[in-house]
């Protein structure tokens, strides 16, 4: 008999006023590789925290059999302790053996991942492990997880990764229950789409039959009413003997029509109700009017050299940033992408910028700096927007259920959505986005793609999501060998 390592029993846990986790019984088994999926704010991280004993469910119990290693989503704090890590692992992941304070976001993620993987446990929990990781890091993670000997539960919006790793899908539904599917992500998506199509067919059939019966009942009621009116008129007249039988026949027909109408209505009552297929809220980021620039190349770099600590990142580089284009900066962790974005934003020596350029900057770890105020208050304060306008923006992003929640308890995806909403509410004509896709669910990613493709100004961004880069970039600049190469 297969041995379980995790057991949920009668869980009920409130997430927001309108959303909760509701799990009757759920098991994770030894050697099972589970992808936990669901939209931002549906409780994925909360579920992992319950397993790791960091969050206690309001009712119900979570049992675990075995030690747990947990890669947490929002905790990017790392210690300067290289002695506990395998040197070959550090080399394989290209993690520099210097102080963690000077590491990039991607290098910190690799270091933290190496810490978790170096210590084997029979239960491994990974919450968005690919955020900040370059191709080297993702490939390494993929290989490790393929041969991991234990129970794995992974939360990731990296569809390629979970497709290759997972043999079981846990999908958090709108009602807070969890649907379990045996198979990989693509198989689950295909089955789900077929089920939605079949549900739509049954729903349309149900509505059509309901309308047909309703019309038939109405027709019989009308027929009975007309017969009753005809009988009433005849009663007010002197009825000849030869018309008496005709009057009785009308009464009989009227009763028959009434009886048929009641029979049809009973059929309607006993008609098995079919629910409408679940439809998803379409997300939209705010699209403000921006200050236009009549300058083909409003930002120019001449002989730019960038140094971080003792490491030289760029040497005597030149580039021009064209107006109205989306430019992706790509390259391995630690090559200087974030440092270059900061240099451009602060317009350091070597970078000439038109005075008409107005920049807005989304920093890679922006989600760490939010104040302990409600979502609604944060957006109003950061954008000087009215309450009604702020409510409309949050509703468009599917955050209407969390208006009064503190920013400190939001999921990574919810924090990222909020940060981007603040940024996009400005009139900036240049957006600098450092890893904006981290934590975002698929629907929000699509909304971000739509926004970026419509944005009339400059967008300079970084992302390790190759599919996203392909969909939104006009140009690709690769940072390598202390230089920048256009690889569009």
Curated annotation (Swiss-Prot):
Pfam families to which the protein is assigned, alphabetical: ABC_tran
Residues binding ATP 1, per UniProt: 38-45
Keywords: Antibiotic resistance, ATP-binding, Nucleotide-binding, Plasmid, Repeat
Biased composition (Low complexity): 222-233
Biased composition (Basic and acidic residues): 245-255
Span of domain ABC transporter: 6-199, 299-487
Region (Disordered): 211-255
Organism superkingdom: Bacteria
The protein's role, per its UniProt record: Confers resistance to 14-membered ring macrolides (like erythromycin) and to B streptogramins, by acting as an ATP-dependent efflux pump.
Entry note about domains: Composed of two homologous domains.
Family: Belongs to the ABC transporter superfamily.
Listed name of the protein: Erythromycin resistance ATP-binding protein MsrA
Lineage, highest ranks first: Bacteria, Bacillati, Bacillota, Bacilli, Bacillales
